[in-house]
Amino acid sequence: MTFHLDAFDLDAFVAATFAEDLGEGGDITSAAVIPADTRFTGVMDTREPIVLAGLPIAEAFFRALDPEVSIERLVEDGDRVEAGADLLRLSGKARALLTAERPALNIVQHLCGIATLTRRYVDAIAGTGAILLDTRKTIPGLRVLEKYATRMGGAENHRMGLWDAAMIKDNHVAVAGSVAEAVRRAAAAGIARIIVEVDRLDQIEPALAAGATHLLLDNMDVSVLREAVALVAGRVPTEASGGITVETIRAKAETGVTYISVGRITQSAPAADIGLDFASE
């Protein structure tokens, strides 16, 4: 099965990861301890309930070192599985599989952790109509993968980068002199999507009048957020953001906002407890 993500070169990612891990000397432990013709079978499993993300990427690490490896995928990305579930079965050259083990586990643990935390947030707002968004708070070089993981968890992607929409924040406003002036400048530059961060109710009308197409309601408590949504009255999408946790997100969603963005689903997700056990054939 071919795995493809726009703007992501999986082969280059795998090669760079191995270059970092192997250096010039290679896997000296496996070379010394494991005879060249030894074959292994292995099972990747989870020790906790998780949402899957990144299994095709883990497979790519094994196939890069053993193109003839046999891999049986037992679940698919986006699936929710219980503790003890087997994820992959593989059989191939022992040295290659041992060398690829840690990079493969690193990425699948990281991405499953993101997908699992994301699903907790999505479940918390079920039935409210609000949509969970991720943010640009990602590890440099891993954004495409991390945003893929949030999608597997049920979120939608916010901006992929600075290029795909204007987002006017407090520092832009400070330089421009006002919210309205910052929005006018973005509109004059021909930018179609203009997201404006506001943290006070009196900023809403000036932002809308100047041409904002989306309002980010930053760090507002529930009562102020509800009032802000009423003031906007559906003229543009609204987005709650700022310090939102699994425990507080539902109250924010019930104010009627269109979106809720949460940085911690990528920034603070713990790695999933996933392991890989091998045995000689």
Task: Walk through the language-model features, giving the residues of each.
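Cys/His-rich Zn2+-binding cysteine-cluster or related metal-binding knuckle/ribbon modules and their
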Residues: 246
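Acidic/glycine-rich phosphate/pyrophosphate-binding loops and surrounding catalytic core
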Residues: 2-210, 223-231, 237-239, 250-259, ...
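Active-site loop ensemble at the mouth of alpha/beta enzyme cores that anchors a bound cofactor
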Residues: 275-280
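Short beta->alpha hinge that forms the Motif I/post-I loop of the SAM-binding pocket
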Residues: 220
